[in-house]
């Protein structure tokens, strides 16, 4: 089913992109707290958002009324270098933003599937999200919903009652077990921000997006507004 392409918002430099993204995210959280009293922030991992989180951590917002969680996570403890929780704790949950609560996806001492089930209570309590921040992979994945993965269909099903899924490794990705919020959970918000850099991702998202790509499900849903912020 065709859908109207979302215009990409381009910035002249990555520094400008990071500044703008931080402002958009903190503004959305502040507005949502005024409306709902308490909200969540679903934060993505990876290298691109770290400078955005550094900026957000210095900004004034009603952080004590915000619960931060993750769009997805590797099934590793926060002390692991690849942990998204570790990234968020180092870059966002410091300074002003240290007042925010945190709802993890990974739980130690339980199985992969049990961790996903256990995470759902915290994620559900964090909704509605004031804003959701997502990256997009070169294969069109978002969160840890990868093309060809056995959990993709359930992850994209807006009617599922699951908020968090245990995503197994698959070929070619992911290489490690993951935990991922579902599209149904990620759209419990007024605003989803896609933060992307580089020519390849611009080509992926600019204009008509291949409907077979997982990210197409984000762009064609009508529950939440989507903004795409990009810089080379």
From Swiss-Prot:
CDD domains: 6PGL (cd01400). Keywords: Hydrolase. One of its GO terms (biological process) is pentose-phosphate shunt. It catalyses: 6-phospho-D-glucono-1,5-lactone + H2O = 6-phospho-D-gluconate + H(+). GO terms for molecular function: 6-phosphogluconolactonase activity. Pathway: Carbohydrate degradation; pentose phosphate pathway; D-ribulose 5-phosphate from D-glucose 6-phosphate (oxidative stage): step 2/3. The keyword Chloroplast does not apply. The keyword Hydrolase applies. Transmembrane segments: none annotated. InterPro entries: 6-phosphogluconolactonase_DevB, Glc/Gal-6P_isomerase, NagB/RpiA_transferase-like, PGLS. Its EC number is 3.1.1.31. It comes from the Bacteria. Hydrolysis of 6-phosphogluconolactone to 6-phosphogluconate. PANTHER family: 6-PHOSPHOGLUCONOLACTONASE (PTHR11054:SF0). Belongs to the glucosamine/galactosamine-6-phosphate isomerase family. 6-phosphogluconolactonase subfamily. This is 6-phosphogluconolactonase.
